[in-house]
UniProtKB/Swiss-Prot annotation:
GO biological process: DNA replication, removal of RNA primer; mismatch repair
Keyword field: Cytoplasm, Endonuclease, Hydrolase, Manganese, Metal-binding, Nuclease
EC top class, as a word: hydrolase
Catalytic activity: Endonucleolytic cleavage to 5'-phosphomonoester
Listed name of the protein: Ribonuclease HII
Subcellular location as annotated: Cytoplasm
CDD domains: RNase_HII_bacteria_HII_like
Domain RNase H type-2: 1-191
Co-factor(s): Mn(2+); Mg(2+)
Amino acid sequence: MIVAGVDEAGRGPLFGPVVAAAVILNEEIDGLDDSKKLTSRKREKLFLEIIKKSYFAISIATADEIDKFNILHATEIAMDRALERLRKKINFDIAFVDGKNLNLKFPFKCIVKGDSLVKEISAASILAKVVRDRIIVSYAKKFSSYMLEKHKGYPTQLHLKLIKEHGLTPLHRLTYKPVMELLSITQLEEWYKSGMIDEERYKKIISKMEVPLFGIQDTR
């Protein structure tokens, strides 16, 4: 039986995408574990070994999709995308997925703490974590005020302090409570009118803020 391991990185941050990876190992790799238990240096070393010794695919769901569909469904979307890409390279019988209460389009089994128990999931967790960190660091120059390279978008005291000082961006997850508490209607309207966020996302955020829609007829 060919098993693909699937995991995500980035459900908790306030900024940027959630990243999912799917992995089928071709060779044994020593030192695989939940990416959160490994140092950055160890993750990077294992990352290079995994991509040499496996079939893999990586995908994301954006902050826009997280706001529209919620983080659980956005995670499922990212995982399905990764599995779809992987299946184009090699067929598999089942996907073992870290976590619980997920619903994917492919045959799958959820395994609680799977990133520590199943080597394929451990490998996927490492790929997802390394790629997500690289994505966030790539934004650091454009959004230098937020010091993304230090906290990777997570809700640290530093990140929240910098949001209060410099405001938000459309790449922040605007439906997350710590972010929404700092989001002004004026800013949201400016992004919508300038095309930086679309109508669907605008409506979703407004509905969670429990304020009237500005200039938009709700057709639901």
